[in-house]
């Protein structure tokens, strides 16, 4: 299972969404982006992950705004935890890219 599939399943367990909606509203891509990537076992692009992280944090902020209901606060915290996973993936990709670029420069 790819990182993106794992994230989709986590979000879908909190608030059921279609793969088309995930592609459009969460990844900021075309309707078939996620399904196509999944079929080819490809990860989402860095750009799509940044959009995803922003959407997750937006969901968290909406749920936390003037809210004291424990269920909604808990849901907001779950969105934040997923956003941190996405941020970690973006950071790991940046590090790998930097290391790869350094090796290429040496050649």
Model-assigned labels for residue ranges:
Residues 65-107:
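Helix-turn-helix/homeodomain-like alpha-helical modules used for DNA recognition
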Residues 4-7, 49, 92-95:
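Short amphipathic alpha-helical segments that mediate assembly, nucleic-acid/protein binding
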Residues 47-64:
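DNA major-groove recognition helix of helix-turn-helix/homeodomain DNA-binding modules
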Residues 22-23:
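Short alpha-helical "recognition helix" segments of helix-turn-helix
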Residues 1-14:
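A short, Lys/Arg-rich alpha-helix, primarily the initiator
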Residues 6-7, 33, 52-55:
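A general alpha-helix detector
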Residues 27-46:
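Recognition helix of helix-turn-helix/homeodomain-like DNA-binding domains
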Residues 16-18:
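Residue-level signal for the short linker/turn that defines the boundary of a DNA-recognition helix
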């Amino acid at each position: 299972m790819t990182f993106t599939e794992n994230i989709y399943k986590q979000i879908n367990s909190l608030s059921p969404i279609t793969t088309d909606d995930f592609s459009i509203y969460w990844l900021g891509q075309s309707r078939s982006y996620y399904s196509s990537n999944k079929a080819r076992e490809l990860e989402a692009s860095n750009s799509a992950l940044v959009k995803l992280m922003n959407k997750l944090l937006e969901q968290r902020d909406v749920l936390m705004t003037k809210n004291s209901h424990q269920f909604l606060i808990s849901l907001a915290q779950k969105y934040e935890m997923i956003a941190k996973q996405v941020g970690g993936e973006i950071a790991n990709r940046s590090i790998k890219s930097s290391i790869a670029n350094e090796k290429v420069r040496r050649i």
